Amino acid sequence: MNQEVMNLFNQQAQPQSFDQIKISISSPEKILSWSYGEIKKPETINYRTFKPERDGLFCARIFGPIKDYECLCGKYKRMKYKGVICEKCGVEVTLARVRRDRMGHIELAAPVAHIWFLKSLPSRIGLLLDMALKDLERILYFESYVVIEPGLTPLKERQLLSEEEYLRAQEEYGEDSFTAMIGAEAIRRILQELDLEGIATALKEEIATTTSELKPKKLMKRLKIIEAFQLSGNKPEWMILTVVPVIPPDLRPLVPLDGGRFATSDLNDLYRRVINRNNRLKRLIELRAPDIIIRNEKRMLQEAVDALFDNGRRGRVITGANKRPLKSLADMLKGKQGRFRQNLLGKRVDYSGRSVIVVGPELKLHQCGLPKKMALELFKPFIYARLDAKGFSATVKQAKKLVEKEKPEVWDILDEVIREHPVMLNRAPTLHRLGIQAFEPKLIEGKAIQLHPLVCAAFNADFDGDQMAVHVPLSLEAQLEARVLMMSTNNILHPANGQPIIVPSQDIVLGLYYLSIVADGAVGEHKADDKNNPMQGVFGDIGQLEHALAAKTVSLHSKIKWRWRGLGPDGEPVSKIYDTTPGRVILSGVLPLHPKVPFDVVNKLMTKKEISAMIDTVYRHCGQKESVIFCDRIMALGFSHAFRAGISFGKDDMVVPENKWSIVDDTRALVKDYEQQYNDGLITQGEKYNKVVDAWAKCSDKLAAEMMGRISAVQKDDKGADKQVNSIYMMSHSGARGSPAQMKQLAAMRGLMAKPSGEIIETPIISNFKEGLDVLEYFNSTHGARKGLADTALKTANSGYLTRRLVDVAQDAVIRETDCGTTNGIKMRAIIDAGQVVAPLAIRILGRATAEDLVAQDGTVIVKTGETIEERHLPAINAAGIQEVKIRSVLVCQTKSGVCATCYGRDLARGTPVNMGEAVGVIAAQSIGEPGTQLTMRTFHIGGAAQIADSSFIESSFEGTIKIRNRSLAKNSDGDLIATGRSVAVVIVGPDGTERAVHRLQYGAKVRVDEGDTIKRGQRIAEWDPYTRPIVAEVDGIVGYEDLYDGQSITETTDESTGIAKRVVIDWRGSARTSDLKPAMLVLDQDGKPVKLARGSDARYFLPVDAIIGLDPGAKVKAGDVLARVSTESAKTRDITGGLPRVAELFEARRPKDAAIIAEKSGTIQFGRDYKNKRRLTLTPHDGSEAVEYLIPKGKHIHLQDGDVVELGDYIVDGNPAPHDILAIKGVEELAAYLVNEIQEVYRLQGVSINDKHIEVIVRQMLQKVEITDGGDSDILTGDQIDRTELAEYNEKLLAEGKKPIQGVPVLLGITKASLQTKSFISAASFQETTRVLTEAAVNGKVDTLEGLKENVIVGSLIPAGTGSLAADIRSIARRRDSLILQQRSAENAANAAELSELPPAAAE
């Protein structure tokens, strides 16, 4: 009995737990099995009684009662009749909730094609039948007949006949001699009669025998879909519907508005149209209406069902009464407002609130101030429970009343409830995981949330009206996770780069900086040579010092001697005397006592960088608790001293250099000189522009340097003592506020501005803000500012979209095992750009595991294979002069799904080895995406002031001796050494004989060193003009022209403003007469024959379009002289506008517009016969393999000559290389290095630091797929793409059976494509192109094993990462045990049954 009572209350079965989801095409039987009844009428509800109409779209008999446990006519009410079906109205007495999950159906009078399988490209029905979509539509929409059985007539099977042709054929051959049909019935019949096995066999044979290039691809597509139908158990005819399911009424509600009107879901309108047309069709068929009317009605039914499934996919969009397109079933799923993204991936939650934030400087780092009113509302259930437990109230109702009246006991209980109960604060946009953190609430008066100043950087919050949301973790587990994982004290380091994120900023920095300034000649200074008072300024303990400060006998900045007492390396007390200032001593008072944290940490000028380094040191050595306490103390100290210092901002603090105008005048003269050169025809318009812009940029920098010199100078008083430091300089130098670029605009000159197009305006703004701009300057500067504001708005969206794509591609990269055991690795070197080390090796390898022993020169092993490189190893690595380290990387990780902890290395946010189940993919995506948004929002801070960044020289970053590889240098007429070859490299050899650096020289560069020279650090090796690419003679001789005819391939342009002529190569391919010219310059000997070069070919130099010729025919030329030059594009400003699209372009693996052509092998270049308007280049490889041909458009500048030798991977034609080419030619490691460096360069330009491993994780996800080059002994076809892991599994099986394994090459997919091709169809569908993904998944009968994070969020289970991964492991163990128990049971049962069967019959009974 008890059991029954329990069942009574427990109506609906608990949601069952599942491990996978399968999607397939539903058969008509399946649809009927879901349905609770057929819907025959289009009516919804009765307008007078508001009761649903019987057999209508809201029918209670089919879908269930409107009110809980009450039938429609009211005969049966209450729980006791549960399950009874009313004989009057036919409604089952049960919960009204069943109206959310009971479905109905509509029996169609004529079959209808499912638009998804018809129109979703590629058309599945079209592929199966091998018919064009156009033809299919003509059949389905009743325009043409299709022949099904030709019989003995000359018609062909599946031939299309128009109405007239059909009638004619019937007359000619007789009505019964052949069968032709029209509409969805025809297609259904053809699909039913398909012999899938036969077609598959025929296709396989054809693929094997075909010779053409394109045909196998087409056949493979068709074979794939046929095999999909065979394997999935879907029947082709199910793509034609005979029954339409109707979704439950509560999912398409009809809600009464006031005023007697109704708001309805669009689906009801769409269903109504289908039912109306279906009923009309039934009636017409019964009435035996003429064929043409019935056909028209069938066509309309087809269109109505199309609109229901996917409105607007074909034909006109069906609109409602207010001219707005109706939302069909497909629209319900897709897009930001669709079911996936709106309701499944992001839900609104209760127990949350939001309010404005204000600063809370007296809070501890783990606290936040929560307004009492908010807390009372958020913690209501807890308060009710506690009131009840304490006996203040007997019922919830009483408790409610107490809380509403805000009785004093309620506040006491609120205090108890809140104690130790963390809340989560979140600021939108949440760009990375630090955008939501847990704090302990502290009750405050007022209505604003108080936030600790040090966590602002993580939230990117400021107090100018930002709002934040509060969420309450309810369950004990949630509170535990919030405290252990999300507490602000546990998030001290930034997950993107492992540096502290809890860094003081603004006032705190200013206060600490002020505290650590040293002043000369301040009061109470210690002078060693002062005989009268040798002990002045000598202090031994802090009390004494504080007294002196209070008595003003010493100032914060005086130089003093101080006895510091701390701990030695073994923890024993030591003391040491330092030269320092009282301010720094006060600062040292907050340092934790630790042998590794000496006084030197604070005995320096504290800028923001130094403070960050200090926090880092404390965190690494003293652990988390000490660091948190230290941060809080340092904050209090900074604030109090900034307040006492009284640093202010005055107009006289902006010092304009006195020599400003002389510098400006010098530059003006220089610009005038360039104008003159241009007028004289020595330089082109473009070159003049570049030089002018350059000159002004240099002037601007020089002025800025002068101004900085003036501002940073300390003012002295009449005694020669330091009076005060410039306030603005202190703010900028400390990193509290403002940057040198802003100071430059305030007090030097605003400098160059950019046009909205990104070009730099030639005339700079010479005034600064202190002097004020004149009207013209102001107008010029508005350009940049306006562009900045417009860009910000646009790019925030772009950046968010990039983050979304990154998260989607990386969401299933989770740490799954400790070590995958691979021996592979990737090589890491320091990154050097224009002679500067931009990323030192030590920083790049820190926290990564080695792939081979790291050995010093004396043979001692610094780090063993598989160990992690820690901070303690770095000094030894640097001392050993190691240039290259092979480390483990996720790119080579062999873990099946996910990655292993060893390949990933250190968890940057914790500074420890990464934990199992850490979602490293999502962290990588957030780390790359978050600064994208930051940067885009930051463009306008410098008001579009132009930055010119182009390197035009190489400086040595090492000392050593010079060696020159592939030497082809020549002395030109000016006596300079010029690089005349493409592969000249300068090698710097260290004193120990190792190669320290290799610099490949630009062709045409002036070389400042020669073989055997010794070189110092910072010395110039070579330089070149960044704005032009020269074509250089390699031998001495006389200039000759070839195919350079005036007006055909060359033109003398006279510059209008100067009247000077110059010769430029023009596009000669335009007319047929000139298309086979090959314009070139020759170097001739005395007899007028071309000089032979060392490699055997003539000294002939082909010229590209737009080359400017510098010498006349007959002029003498020396090797190394410039024959002609090609202008490169003028310098555009590089701000992150170039940045974000560039990052997206790299991650999407798009082919660049003018892609570089890369040599596939090492070999020799020959020019072959031209082909149409392309040049033919042949590369004959050194290894004797087949020659490779390249066709290059004629205007492209090929900087190779006949007979040049190229190495594998050299550029034959300049440009950005296509990542796919790098992968194919140089392999995965080179590709990864290229992508990492290119992406890092964009971020580095903006001063954002991201660890390489994040980019590697994303690149790994882009390399998931393999293209099959040889199917081996498997049934996989050549040219197919499958997952890496699948390939490994197949090969394991094949090798075990002794068969030939499959061969494949890795394929690079862009992030969008990779996301759409993930194994999980749920994840792909929730990303983009929902319809296409679901259609394809259904045809293939795909199974989603719910391995990634996203699909688990969507189905509402715990994600398999973090604490959820442990839960998943425990579940799988339980499942294994269950299955074992079941096996044992069934074995026992079988044994018992066997025993029984052996007994004689009587005994068995």
Swiss-Prot record:
Matches recorded under InterPro entries: DNA-dir_RpoC_beta_prime, DNA-dir_RpoC_beta_prime_bact, RNA_pol_asu, RNA_pol_N, RNA_pol_Rpb1_1, RNA_pol_Rpb1_3, RNA_pol_Rpb1_3_sf, RNA_pol_Rpb1_4
E.C. code: 2.7.7.6
Highest taxon in the source lineage: Bacteria
Cofactor binding remark: Binds 1 Mg(2+) ion per subunit. Binds 2 Zn(2+) ions per subunit.
Xref: CDD domains: RNAP_beta'_C (cd02655), RNAP_beta'_N (cd01609)
Keyword field contains Secreted: no
UniProt-annotated binding residues for Zn(2+) 1: 71, 73, 86, 89
Gene3D superfamilies in UniProt: 1.10.132.30, 1.10.150.390, 1.10.1790.20, 1.10.40.90, 2.40.40.20, 2.40.50.100, RNA polymerase II, clamp domain (4.10.860.120), RNA polymerase Rpb1, domain 3 (1.10.274.100)
Cofactor section: Mg(2+); Zn(2+)
Residues that coordinate or bind Mg(2+): 462, 464, 466
Record's GO cellular component terms: DNA-directed RNA polymerase complex
MF (Gene Ontology): DNA binding; DNA-directed RNA polymerase activity; magnesium ion binding; zinc ion binding
UniProt keyword terms in alphabetical order: DNA-directed RNA polymerase, Magnesium, Metal-binding, Nucleotidyltransferase, Transcription, Transferase, Zinc
Keyword RNA-binding included in the entry's annotation: no
Entries under SUPFAM superfamilies matching the protein: beta and beta-prime subunits of DNA dependent RNA-polymerase
Biological processes, Gene Ontology terms: DNA-templated transcription
Residues that bind Zn(2+) 2: 820, 893, 900, 903
Function statement: DNA-dependent RNA polymerase catalyzes the transcription of DNA into RNA using the four ribonucleoside triphosphates as substrates.
Subunit composition and interactions: The RNAP catalytic core consists of 2 alpha, 1 beta, 1 beta' and 1 omega subunit. When a sigma factor is associated with the core the holoenzyme is formed, which can initiate transcription.
Protein name stated in the entry: DNA-directed RNA polymerase subunit beta'
